[in-house]
Amino acid sequence: MSEQERIQDCLRKEIRSLLISTKDGLTPQQLEKEYLLMVGNHLPLRILGYRSTMELVLDMPDVVSVCPCGDGTVILKAIPDESTKGIASLVAKQRRSHKVRNSMQKGRSSVCSGRVPYRGRVPPILPAVVKSELKDLLALSPVLLSDFEKAFARRFGRSFQYMQYGFLSMFEVLSAASDVICVEQTRAGSLLTLKKSASEEKQREWPAGKIFTQPFRMKQQGSYSTGFPVTKTRFSQPISNMEPPKQVLSMEKIPMFNTVEASRLSHTEKLNQLESTFKSVIAQIGPGGTVDPDLKHKIKFVVSKFPQGLFISKLLGEFELVFKEQLSPKQLGFLNVTELVGALSDILRVEFSEEKQDLLVFDADLRPLLPAGPLSSVRNSCLVQPDKRIEANAWASSPSRNSLSTVAVKKTTWDCPLKNHKEAEQKAYKKPNLVVKPLQLQVETNKSQLSLSMANHDIPPDAVRAKKLCRLPPLDTSTLVGVFVEYIISPSQFYVRIYSRDSSELLEDMMIEMRRCYSNQLVSDRYVMPEYFIQPGHLCCVRISEDKWWYRVIIHRILGKKEVEVFYPDFGNIGTVQKSSLRFLKCCYTKLPAQAIPCSLAWVRPAEEHWTSKAILHFQKLCGLKPLVGVVDEYIDGILNIFLCDTSSNEDVYFHHVLRTEGHAIVCRENAPSKGFRDFNPPALYTNSSAAPGDMVLTELGHPAQQHYLNEDGEILQQPQQDINDEKSISHLKSVSEELLKDSKLGPLKTRESCEEEPQWSILKPKDPKEENEDEVPTGMPCLESVTIGDDIWDENWLPLQAKMGKAGGPASHLFTSSLVGKKQYQTRGETTRKDWCFSTSKDIWDDSWQPLGLANDVKGRTHTPEGPIAQEKNIGTTRIRKQPDLQYPLDSSTLPKLEEFYISLIKSQQSAEGSQSEPASIQTPLKPGQASSTAPSSTPAAGDSPENHSGSAPDFSEALHSSKYSHGCLGSSCAVSHVQEPPALVPQCERREA
């Protein structure tokens, strides 16, 4: 059962109970009162679709019996059903009270009294409510005068008792209602029809202020005396300021040609004032005069809140929202709201909107009418009399509100019938001093200039018109960043936002500032976007009504007249908003780049052809609303391929590993282009790239501005940049980078060949992906240990130990590392360094600071085997092959002697190694601290010695280790002093002299 049917069934029971309890029945008016007293609400006529109580009860023939009386009234009695027959019989047996009978008889006699009311000379005025009822009755269909009583009683449930309003006959009623009722004589008799008002026939537009534009009401002539000396007043003749008016009174014309000019002007002013008084009085007597002044003030207040105009269909709703009360035009005597607004033309002005096909209501005082030239004067020729020279001059000189006020007493609809339009215009064109065409051109020019100035004025100077946001610069490979996953389409198509002080906090600050700025109503209205600016690709802002925040958006497409689809560049999603909620974006809010980064999960592809809904849902649950750790892999077609890891628990959870375990994805060792972003990539369409060519070179060479890693507790740390004091190394950075890239292509191949020949290096070869256990870390996933990324290798721009105390390597070390390991630094850097930089003799061991303790001990143990000389020879040869091409490009002239000394030491060390094959004991014996101090102070101590053992011969390195930024990378004492980057003295000076 619907809600309407439930209300109707409940209403039937309530009306039956009310009528059964009354023995003599109730009139429709009494039924309304009794229902209000019993229920507390009025009858739900509008909800059920009825116009009157009589129409409601006629639709209930099984509940209500309509009994007409001889006096024209209607009595409603209940029709009992099976359950209420007993109650009805008991009520019928009740005795009738004499007091009730006398009161009812007195009431009926007072209503239907045939006594003629006393009235004075002024005829009675038909109340507005009665006039509204007559309009409602005749709006359906015309009614014969002989059937008027029956039709009125059928419609409203009561007879039309005109005598209680002061009328003596129905003829007087029709005469008083002649402005709304027209009587036509037909063969069947007098036919009453509803007269169309002048406001419906032709739209009236009047200047605000002194002009009252109520239609002139036809009064009875000769039926009664008004008590005013002027009995016949007509305004059919034109009246001018500069000419003596024609006499409008019913008396003989008095010649005015012999009077002086002063008396003529004073007489003209008096007549003009008298005419204005007549018009204002007639306007107050008209339909608008029946409206309460307080109510008119309220209506004007509501309309004044909309300077751009209020649609007439929304006037009643806005009135109820502002004053919490309903505005009923019928209770005021008007058929609808259009007629009410037309009657209030002294405070309101109506214009027709061709775009919305609706009427717009304006406050006449806030926005006065602008003249539209002779064309509008022809259309509204009743505004101004065109055959007077002074009026034409007023229009041509100053088409403003003041000029309209000066001609306020000229010919209007009061005295200008439509049939005289052509005659008036012909008179105007016959005047030789009136120029029409130049006036039209001038007005059109003013209109175009006005529209242009308004268009420029509506756009704030700091509003964004054709500007685009910039994207964030690309991240470096293997960089660890904190991210929020903002919007997910699939694991291969989602958007992330970096969580850092430079991004997320700046975005929050900007949104707070935008909310503070645009929440001001004046600012919000100032930055409203016109219709012609709402185009795809335009950058603007919008407020979401749910959370009251303002967001930067880019218009994607226009859905209709009221809605557009927008892209949120800071969050990645697409939504639908209203055109009216769009605002211009201030230029100061475009400095922050678009924060949403299009991403794809690295090294995964769907198990099926497309991602399933379960896979997408599982990926959404993994992301959640928490910060994640992202490991940058690479960019493909501008899309960031990134590993996502959840470090909130004790164990790190890699998302691609979870998707593979659940069977949603397949892990592969390469990234495929995202199909979703290939079809539609809003950041590429609507934003500009912010990467410079110089920055791209540094990124490709593996020299990031900042690198990140995880410590032993799983926290995200930031590796600090090294202090670069040598300006020469920075100047040679780009010149050496090209050669290093060339060497990086051949270097790994040579290293691989040399390592394959040595059987003891076979354990360092990468494993086959098929042999990898699925329960362990996925294949190729970077090992997030507390190990630095190969920054502690030897620097060519080394300085003496005293000058280098506490300093790390220069940028050339970064470049050399990148040339060795290529793009995937974090995968093979440890293996390559183990292959190239470990020597077999205990004297010549050079430990890297990032090398783990277990591997250092393993290498140290292998150096004491009898096969050490062979390994030493092969490794020295490998080192010579690797390092000579890289060192043939000197970085500075001061390093040439040192490089020559280094080459000589390599040759001597090779010769000494060949000569020392017969003395394995000397090789197996580790170098003592005393020998190292006596031979070379710059030599590196053995891996097994501690820094304390060298306190007598070398400077104390404790402060250097404490101040070094890489001390956390050492896992044992074997690499404690390797942070001080000195040239490795492979052969002691004393042995070289003996040789």
Curated annotation (Swiss-Prot):
Species for this entry: Rattus norvegicus
Gene Ontology CC: chromatoid body; pi-body; synapse
Family membership: Belongs to the TDRD5 family.
Cell compartments where the protein resides: Cytoplasm
Main location: cytoplasm
Compositional bias (Low complexity): 932-943
InterPro entries noted in UniProt: LOTUS-like, OST-HTH/LOTUS_dom, SNase_OB-fold_sf, TDRD5_LOTUS_2, Tudor, Tudor_domain_containing
Gene: Tdrd5
Region Disordered: start-end pairs: 747-781, 857-892, 911-960
Domain HTH OST-type: 7-80, 122-197, 291-365
Protein's job: Required during spermiogenesis to participate in the repression transposable elements and prevent their mobilization, which is essential for the germline integrity. Probably acts via the piRNA metabolic process, which mediates the repression of transposable elements during meiosis by forming complexes composed of piRNAs and Piwi proteins and govern the methylation and subsequent repression of transposons. Required for chromatoid body (CB) assembly.
Record's keyword annotation contains Glycoprotein: no
Keywords from the named record: Cytoplasm, Developmental protein, Differentiation, Phosphoprotein, Repeat, Spermatogenesis
Classification via PANTHER family: TUDOR DOMAIN CONTAINING PROTEIN, TUDOR DOMAIN-CONTAINING PROTEIN 5
Full protein name: Tudor domain-containing protein 5
